[in-house]
Amino acid sequence: MSAPPQAPGAAARVAVLERRGKFLVAEPFFEAGPRLVVSRDRRADVGDLVVINPGTARNRRGAGRATVARRLGRPDVARDVIEALMIDRGLRRGFDPAVEHEVRDLVELDPTAEALQGAGRRDLRSMPTFTIDPATARDFDDAISAAAEDDGSARMWVHIADVSAYVRPRSLVDREAYRRGTSVYVPGAVEPMLPTALSNNACSLVPGQDRPTVTVEMQIDGDRIRSSSFYRSLIRSDERLDYGRVDQIFDGSANASEPWGAALDVARKVAAALGARRALQSAVELESTEPEFEFDRKGNVTAAAPAEQTESHRLIEHLMIAANEQVAALLEARKVPTLYRVHEPPDGPAAQRLIDQLASLGVPTPPVPRGSMTPQQAADVIGSASQLLERWIASHDGRGRRGLTSLVLRSLKQAHYDNRNLGHSGLQSSSYCHFTSPIRRYPDLICHRALVSAVAGDGPAPDAGWVASAAPWTSAREREAMSIERGADDIALCFILEQRLFEQGSDQVFEGEVVGVIGA
């Protein structure tokens, strides 16, 4: 499968309709461009935000004029503008009927049906299992089971939705998922990689429903993974937990229930041990600075707050990292073609520049080796600096997080996908892949197919040449999605600022932080 072309809808333009004399014209909304005369359309009025198709009018009077393809809403409604951004950047906002038809046939399959079983799928439905996700999540692609062993060790099961059981190579839905590469999450909306019948239903690990999964089983002694095994499985989640509820259980303000309460306690201890080991290895430690937004029913953004990273977030993070590392190590050892998540080591000068910048701002820094730093030494220095920075920010009530975090990120190279295992410097991992989110990332689906071919013999391994071509394609789709998500965040923040200025007056004083410096 070669890299597919851009979405057919990418040529459509987003504009605002305006009246210019006797003509109805489309004024480009996001970027400068020529105004286009538009054929009249009863679906849209002057001032509306619309998608137009240039020069597609067919009647004699309107020949050569643009036509309204879709009315999006109003330019003074945040949700409408974010929707417009997604379309302007080429997102389809839906699936072709042929893809939807293919998916309807897939979701009608019973999870226990022979067509979904594959070779040696283990029945784990009696095992206490739970999910932990954001309160607003709709697609649940990972679940956890855990148990304490008599010898003091622990056994962890990380169950990941078996998307590969439904989405077969070169099927219509597979081609469309590859074209998209990833789901795109913006405030109040999502452009899913898979149709919602799969992402929110058949593949989603909702409680009380049988679901096919791929399981990574790990025996963990302290902070060391003693052994691991991999197999297809069938689970039934007992509880859908969210981060807030888990944090309440951890701080004692809420109670856990059985059958999942004991498993959660074991998982908490295991995750803490794995996290402590990562810290000792100088893994980069940075909390997210992404904002979260609230909307009213009309689509107006009403509130914004920075996303908080808590112990419950870190629990899932550490367990997913462990599973990803184990899968990557197995695939590398067996030389199965797959996509690795690689993060090449930073340069010594970049590490030294970061240390100098942090020190000039009064932030504690780690010792730096004398002379020129090797890439590994640079990675160790930046990782240690990030951990000291996180503690310093926490002691200052979170002030300066966004600007200081950006300094660390700029000192690092950008992570990407590669068919070669080049290691993951930020995590200090010798082998790493993305395996735990196949509902929303295509590279994870590639890893699933590689893994089940290696351990279960279910289908051929991905073709090595095709995997090599998929690496730059999926990396580009990820960067594109991040650009759209950041643009949507900026739009929502602008609406919040506009609302406060309107309600409180333009003479208001706002507190802020310097997050960067540009030349004069």
Predicted region positions:
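Short, charge-rich amphipathic segments
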Residues: 91, 95-96, 104-110, 203-208, ...
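Residue-level "edge-of-site" marker
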Residues: 99, 344, 371-372
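A short, sequence-level motif marking secondary-structure junctions
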Residues: 40-44, 70-73, 231-237, 308-311, ...
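Feature marking long nucleic-acid-engaging regions of large polymerase/nuclease enzymes
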Residues: 34-36, 133-366, 417, 422-459
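Exposed alpha-helical structural elements
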Residues: 67, 81, 98, 102, ...
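Charged, low-complexity, helix-prone segments enriched in Lys/Glu/Asp/Gln
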Residues: 3-5, 78, 82-85, 102-107, ...
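Charge-lined substrate channels and their catalytic hotspots, especially those that engage the 3′ end
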Residues: 1-157, 164-210, 240-241, 245, ...
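Structured C-terminal cores of nucleic-acid metabolism proteins
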Residues: 326, 348, 358-520
